[in-house]
């Protein structure tokens, strides 16, 4: 769907387009619905906002029965409930065009620096009114401060409530953004950390990424349980070939895995099915640490009964082998 958006300067400009199924995942993790107000502080080609708009429109069509009310709600979603900021002029134009082609919603795509030039207000029409954001989605430029966590800090500081889901280079959670992370957790709660497949951006970038999910405007309690999920196997097999139609194949229940991932983050361990205990781990983090956002299930090094039996079996086999060798050598000596 986004094949027309490819452009040659993406590496130079530090722009890596988000796959549409990942954009949809972020939107679901941020709990977007028809009444959400969604913003993105590094909009790129607006893939995340397109996914948000589609989620909002679908929810409206399911829950609103009056045709007139639905038409009004659809217009409101497109005109007032989406906001994006993009600094690069060339990419900004792609975002505008993308939103128009996907059904519009481009009213508040702004060509601004979200870190220095944005005051939290609508861009057009309601430019003196603050945008009441309650959902934040982001795939930031990883070369920015803290791998892009500075965008997260800025956006969350301007929100009064809601949820956020970001995909970012995982070093942001293990030291690269230590001080920023500590500041973020003074006012927001980390709900989940998801390790994504290493080949997620194959052909564009080889960085390891994580998704971090936050509850906004609620200080992180040291006793709060964080969900750590290893999503390295998301069910897709990826290649980097010229024929795009065969570059992404569902080889292991990908749709079901993405659905289960969302349920695990939103509702907890009772939804474990395709995932194993080793891929889902719950524990706490230290809000004063800032480097412990990428935990994984501890490896159990205790030997099992099966391990013990195998060790004994291997030892007895070795003893018998040595005895047989000794007997053979003795018989050879007697024959000389």
Enumerate the predicted regions with their spans.
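A conserved structural/catalytic subdomain of Rossmann-like adenosyl-cofactor enzymes
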Residues: 117, 123-124, 128-336
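Long recognition/docking surfaces used for binding and targeting
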Residues: 1-6
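Nucleotide 5′-phosphate-binding alpha/beta core
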Residues: 9
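Conserved S-adenosyl-L-methionine
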Residues: 12-138, 145, 162, 170-171
């Amino acid at each position: 769907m986004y094949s027309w958006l490819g452009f040659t300067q993406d590496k130079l400009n530090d722009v890596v387009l988000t796959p549409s199924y990942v954009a949809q995942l972020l939107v679901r993790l941020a709990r977007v619905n028809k009444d959400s107000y969604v913003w993105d502080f590094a909009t790129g080609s607006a893939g995340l906002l397109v996914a948000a708009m589609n989620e909002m429109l679908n929810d409206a069509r399911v829950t609103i029965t009056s045709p007139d009310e639905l038409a009004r709600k659809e217009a409101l979603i497109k005109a007032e409930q989406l906001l994006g900021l993009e600094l690069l002029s060339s990419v900004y134009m792609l975002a505008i065009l993308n939103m128009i082609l996907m059904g519009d919603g481009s009213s508040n795509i702004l060509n601004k620096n979200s870190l220095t030039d944005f005051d939290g207000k609508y861009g057009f029409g309601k430019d003196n009114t603050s945008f009441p954001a309650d959902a934040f989605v982001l795939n930031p430029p990883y070369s920015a401060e803290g791998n892009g966590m500075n965008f997260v800090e800025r956006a969350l500081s301007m929100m009064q409530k809601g949820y956020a889901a970001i995909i970012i280079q995982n070093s942001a959670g293990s030291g690269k953004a230590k001080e920023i992370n500590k500041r973020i957790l003074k006012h927001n709660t980390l709900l989940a950390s998801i390790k994504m497949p290493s080949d997620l951006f194959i052909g564009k970038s080889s960085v390891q990424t994580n998704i971090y999910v936050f509850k906004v405007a609620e200080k992180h309690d040291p006793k709060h349980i964080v969900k750590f999920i290893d999503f390295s196997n998301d069910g897709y097999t990826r290649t980097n070939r010229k024929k795009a139609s065969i570059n992404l194949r569902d080889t292991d229940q990908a749709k079901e895995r993405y659905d289960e991932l969302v349920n695990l983050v939103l509702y907890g361990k009772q939804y474990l099915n395709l995932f194993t205990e080793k891929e889902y781990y719950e524990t706490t983090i230290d809000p004063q640490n800032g480097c412990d956002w990428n935990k994984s299930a501890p490896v159990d090094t205790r030997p099992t009964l099966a391990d013990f039996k195998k060790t004994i079996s291997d030892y007895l086999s070795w003893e018998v082998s040595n005895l047989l060798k000794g007997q053979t050598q003795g018989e050879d000596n007697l024959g000389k």
